[in-house]
């Protein structure tokens, strides 16, 4: 059987770093208040000339180089983002042009913070269906440009960045010891769409709008939804939390991460945390955390890695991958 194996990984961050203390002159907050409630200490903010496309292209180049490939080897460019450069054409097409890719196809996918999980799952389906051999999967965001910088409950939470992986078709044996994606589960529930959303768009207000969030409601639902979809992945494979080498969750809030790991009985030392230095980068969150753990040597070939995310909609999902 065909498996989708991670061949390469890369990331990119804006130059500017904004620390918690930098917010003290903008809104009524403090470093202590932010750290206690979120675990965030700093985040990267896009500056002039830095966009979702430029960050996504930089991460993509790094992933292709890490894979030992050329841009011409890529069949599909799949970008998860909620902050595209333009309403259309797709920012994935712009990245395709930046990389000099003239074959295959490219499109954007939008599932907010769950976007990268949705994108990996979609890429896996294209690979196993024979429509693509190598897929560039990117999560890239510039959430700083949809924030209300007078709202202290949201402006301190988010950052900008991009991460990317190259997925490649490989022969597997149908075993959980195979390298590649072993299971993926996605969910959504539109009944919660007004708990986390942007209050504008081309079809309604003809404006970009700002991010709005009912933080307590999001927190209340997050842990249960995350653990439910992860347990479905365990059930599909016969694996358990004890088999997990690394848990790479969406980096939204350390309290949510800690509560999810505890409910799943995943040891703290197996959890990859980057929310302290990146903040919530939405669809870029999981690939940025993955890239960090690969670069520092924690995630190694053969490791069983659990990815998960939850975002506006609500959308949520999980992926089990043998590295």
Curated annotation (Swiss-Prot):
Where does this chain mainly localize? cytoplasm
Give the subcellular location. Answer: Cytoplasm
* Role summary: Catalyzes the condensation reaction of fatty acid synthesis by the addition to an acyl acceptor of two carbons from malonyl-ACP. Catalyzes the first condensation reaction which initiates fatty acid synthesis and may therefore play a role in governing the total rate of fatty acid production. Possesses both acetoacetyl-ACP synthase and acetyl transacylase activities. Its substrate specificity determines the biosynthesis of branched-chain and/or straight-chain of fatty acids.
Q: Which Pfam families match?
A: ACP_syn_III, ACP_syn_III_C
Which HAMAP family does this UniProt record tie to the protein? FabH
Q: What is known of its domains?
A: The last Arg residue of the ACP-binding site is essential for the weak association between ACP/AcpP and FabH.
User: Which PANTHER family does the UniProt record give?
Assistant: 3-OXOACYL-[ACYL-CARRIER-PROTEIN] SYNTHASE, BETA-KETOACYL-[ACYL-CARRIER-PROTEIN] SYNTHASE III, CHLOROPLASTIC
Per UniProt, subunit arrangement is: Homodimer.
Q: Where is this region: ACP-binding?
A: 251-255
Q: Which GO terms describe its biological process?
A: fatty acid biosynthetic process
Q: What is its EC number?
A: 2.3.1.180
Q: Name one GO molecular function term.
A: 3-oxoacyl-[acyl-carrier-protein] synthase activity
Residues the record marks as active site? 113, 250, 280
Pathway(s) of this molecule: Lipid metabolism; fatty acid biosynthesis
Q: Which GO terms describe its cellular component?
A: cytoplasm
Catalytic activity entry: malonyl-[ACP] + acetyl-CoA + H(+) = 3-oxobutanoyl-[ACP] + CO2 + CoA
- Family, similarity comment: Belongs to the thiolase-like superfamily. FabH family.
Keyword Transferase set for record: yes
What is the protein name for this chain?
A: Beta-ketoacyl-[acyl-carrier-protein] synthase III
Transmembrane feature ranges: none
Say which domain of life the source belongs to: Bacteria
The UniProt entry, under CDD domains, shows:
KAS_III (cd00830)
Alphabetically sorted, this entry's keywords are:
Acyltransferase, Cytoplasm, Fatty acid biosynthesis, Fatty acid metabolism, Lipid biosynthesis, Lipid metabolism, Multifunctional enzyme, Transferase
């Amino acid at each position: 059987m065909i498996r989708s194996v991670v061949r390469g990984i890369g990331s990119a961050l804006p130059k500017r770093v904004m620390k918690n203390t930098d917010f003290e002159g903008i809104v009524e907050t403090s470093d202590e208040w932010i750290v206690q409630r979120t675990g965030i200490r700093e985040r990267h903010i896009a500056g002039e000339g830095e966009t979702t496309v430029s960050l996504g292209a930089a991460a993509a180049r790094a992933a292709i180089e890490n894979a030992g490939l050329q841009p011409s080897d890529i069949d599909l460019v799949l970008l998860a983002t909620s902050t595209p450069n333009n309403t259309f054409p797709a920012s994935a097409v712009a990245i395709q042009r930046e990389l000099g890719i003239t074959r295959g196809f490219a499109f954007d996918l939008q599932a907010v913070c769950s976007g990268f999980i949705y994108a990996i799952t979609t890429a896996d389906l294209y690979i196993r269906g024979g429509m693509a051999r190598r897929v560039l999967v990117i999560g890239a965001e510039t959430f700083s440009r949809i924030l209300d910088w007078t709202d202290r409950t949201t402006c301190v939470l988010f950052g900008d960045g991009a991460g990317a992986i190259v997925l490649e078709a490989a022969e597997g044996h149908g075993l959980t010891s195979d390298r590649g994606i072993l299971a993926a589960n996605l969910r959504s529930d539109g009944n919660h769409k007004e708990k986390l959303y942007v209050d504008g768009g081309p079809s309604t207000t003809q404006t970009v709008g700002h991010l709005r969030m009912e933080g307590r409601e999001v927190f209340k639902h997050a842990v249960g939804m995350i653990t439910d979809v992860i347990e479905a992945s365990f059930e599909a494979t016969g694996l358990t939390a004890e088999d997990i080498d690394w848990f790479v969750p969406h980096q939204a809030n350390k309290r949510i991460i800690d509560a999810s790991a505890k409910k799943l009985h995943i040891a703290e030392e197996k959890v990859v945390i980057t929310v302290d230095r990146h903040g919530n980068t939405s669809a870029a969150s999981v690939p940025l955390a993955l890239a960090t753990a690969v670069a520092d040597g924690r995630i190694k070939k053969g490791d069983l890695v659990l990815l998960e995310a939850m975002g506006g909609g609500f959308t949520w999902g999980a992926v089990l991958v043998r590295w």
